[in-house]
Amino acid sequence: MQDFAAIDFETANFERSSVCSVGIVIVRGGEIVDSFYSLIQPEPNYYQWRCTQVHGLTRADTDEAPVFSEVWKQIEPLIEGLPLVAHNTPFDKGCLRACLMTYQMDYLDYEFFDTLKAARRILPHLPNHQLQTV
């Protein structure tokens, strides 16, 4: 796959709609051509300790951040027509669906590819398949 958008969401709590940051890398012709990162004010706007332990973000980091609908207006043109790649696709796809539903925005049927699933198949000898290990 030569053209794709790698996408990663982080959440403030265990609600998929509570996205507090998004990172995207655009790849065309096998080369990184663009990237995007934004903090997002989550909905609902509270942080669970376990989530903060994963990504290090707190409410203080996102209190002044834009809401998802504002950030999505910047993201949508970047990823238009590209398949999306994520590590543990059910999580990231679920976050995207939940946020779009929360803000009453249309969900296009984005094509997702899962690097976690691929890593488990291709690298079965690894002790785990977390992103930092792979």
List each model region and its residues.
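Conserved non-catalytic scaffold segment of RNase H-like nuclease domains
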Residues: 1-110, 124-134
